[in-house]
Design a protein with these regions (language model features):
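Conserved alpha-helix/loop element of class I SAM-dependent methyltransferases that forms part
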Residues: 47-63
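Class I SAM-dependent methyltransferase "Motif I" SAM/SAH-binding loop
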Residues: 70-72
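Class I SAM-dependent methyltransferase SAM/SAH-binding core
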Residues: 75, 79-116
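A short SAM/SAH-binding and catalytic strip from SAM-dependent methyltransferases
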Residues: 127-138
């Protein structure tokens, strides 16, 4: 795969701010109409909910040292230890999830990512994983910085809140989205920092971070990231490193 740069080449800028007066509103209405029509099509969904684990497993070298931040019940780390022979370490704040990790035989530390990773030396791990955790953190930028301090590479995945179904709910229905993959209302969701693909690329470009590779979930199927995926991607996974 051709290595994309971290300078917005993955998502093109459309220059809407420079349109003639009234043209922006016209184009915005056209986009909403198109998105409404597409939103009527059922999403295939991802039956397993584990598409990211397949890609993460491929991206991690055999025998690598791996730190999984917000490791949940330890499912991913258990798989990586078994299939990729990694030296794994999980970090999780939820006591019940920590017990699940212990039951699986997965090494785990109970800790709050918001407190930082001061206990971990620089470049102590080959890969640091942040799977479906970033949007739930109080200080996501600080955790991203820590991820790239303690790891040679990072793998980050998150729901794309610029997906067209989300935009339709917000613009056309004035409602926060509730989907099969995100079945929680705004007052019970753990997602406190809503992130988009473009926002992640902006952070990378401004922080000296290179996007090594990228993948998306579109209509229930995973594939490599394309330049026009900012509205199509339901979920995003990127591999990053310091430029």
């Amino acid at each position: 795969m051709t290595q994309p740069r971290a300078d917005h080449n993955l998502v093109t800028d459309r220059g809407l701010a420079h349109l003639p007066e009234g043209e922006f509103e016209k184009r915005a209405a056209e986009v909403v109409a198109l998105m409404k029509a597409r939103a009527q099509r059922p999403s295939n969904g991802d039956p397993s909910g584990r598409w990211q684990e397949e890609i993460i497993s491929r991206e991690i070298p055999l025998g690598a040292s791996v730190l999984d931040l917000g490791c949940g019940d330890g499912f991913l780390l258990e798989r990586l230890i078994r299939e990729r022979n990694v030296r794994g370490q999980g970090v999780e704040i939820d006591p019940d999830q920590v017990f699940s990790c212990v039951d699986r035989g997965v090494p785990v530390i109970q800790a709050d990512l918001g407190a930082g990773l001061r206990w971990c030396p620089d470049k102590a791990f080959d890969v640091v994983v942040l799977e479906e955790t970033l949007q739930t953190l109080q200080s996501p930028r600080e955790v991203l910085e820590e991820m790239l301090r303690v790891g040679k590479r990072g793998i980050v995945s998150f729901p794309n809140f610029a997906h067209f179904r989300v935009v339709v709910d917000l613009v056309a229905r004035s409602r926060m989205p509730v989907t099969p993959r995100r079945p929680f209302y705004w007052y019970e969701s753990a997602n406190i920092h809503l992130l988009t693909l473009r926002a992640l690329l902006d952070w990378a470009a401004g922080s000296g971070v290179r996007i090594v590779s990228g993948y998306v979930l579109v209509d229930g199927a995973s594939r490599e990231l394309r330049p026009d995926d900012d509205l199509l991607a339901e979920e995003v996974l990127v591999v990053v490193e310091r430029a």
